[in-house]
Amino acid sequence: MTAAASAGRLLLAVFAVAVFVFAQAAGEDNAFMPKGGRALLLDLLGVPPDQTELRAIAQARRTEPEWRDFVAARKSALTERELATLTAYLAVNMPMSEDAVKRGNLASALPPDGRDLAWSGCQPCHSLFASHLTQRRQVQGWRNMFLSPFHRELKMSPQEREEFARYSALNMPMKIEDVPPDLRF
C-alpha cells in the first residue's frame, strides 16, 4: 500500500471517529431502534440481573428452538419480534467464553447485540438511515453485505457478523417517522 493510500485511510478513519464522537456528544443514542438481544435479556432478568441466573444462561448451550422455549417459559411481555430477536441473540452468542463468564459484572461482559453493532459499526462510515434502517433483507442478504471489500475489513468477528445479520433481518426496515429527523438521510 502506498503512503498516500495509507494517509487517506487514516484520514478517513479519523473523520469517521470524529463524526461518531460528535453524534455521541450531541446526545443522540440508539434508543429509537428496536432493542437487541443483549438489551432484551437484561430487561428480562431485571435490574440488577441475578448474577447466578445470568451466569447459568451465559454457560448454556441450546439450539434456537430450545432458547425460544426457555424464554417463553418465563412468561414475559415480549412481542413476537422481541422473542425472536432475543432467541437469535442467545443462539448466536451463548455459551460465552469461560474468561467472560468469570468476570465480576457479567452483564457488562455480554456480547454486543445487533443494535449495538449497527450503531457503532455502520454510522461512523455512512448514513445509518440509508445503509441500515430502511433496508429489508433476509438473513443471507445481510450476511452477503459483509462480502463487499470495504465491509470485509470491518473489525467484527464471525459471531458479531451473524448477530448483526440476524438482528437486522428481524428488525429492519424501520418506519421513517420512527427515526429521529437528525438521523434521516
Residue spans of the language-model regions?
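C-terminal capping alpha-helices of c-type cytochrome domains
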Residues: 76-100, 154-185
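Acidic/histidine-rich, surface-exposed loop or edge segments in extracytoplasmic proteins
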Residues: 67-72, 123-127, 147
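Bacterial N-terminal signal peptides that target proteins for export
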Residues: 1-12
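Electrostatic cytochrome c docking/interface patches
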Residues: 26-56, 70-78, 82, 88-116
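The canonical Cys-X-X-Cys-His
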Residues: 44-49, 86, 118-129, 164, ...
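Short acidic, glycine/proline-enriched loop segments that cap or flank alpha-helices
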Residues: 77-78, 128-137, 153-156
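Short cysteine/histidine-rich metal-coordination sites, predominantly Zn2+-binding motifs
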Residues: 137-146
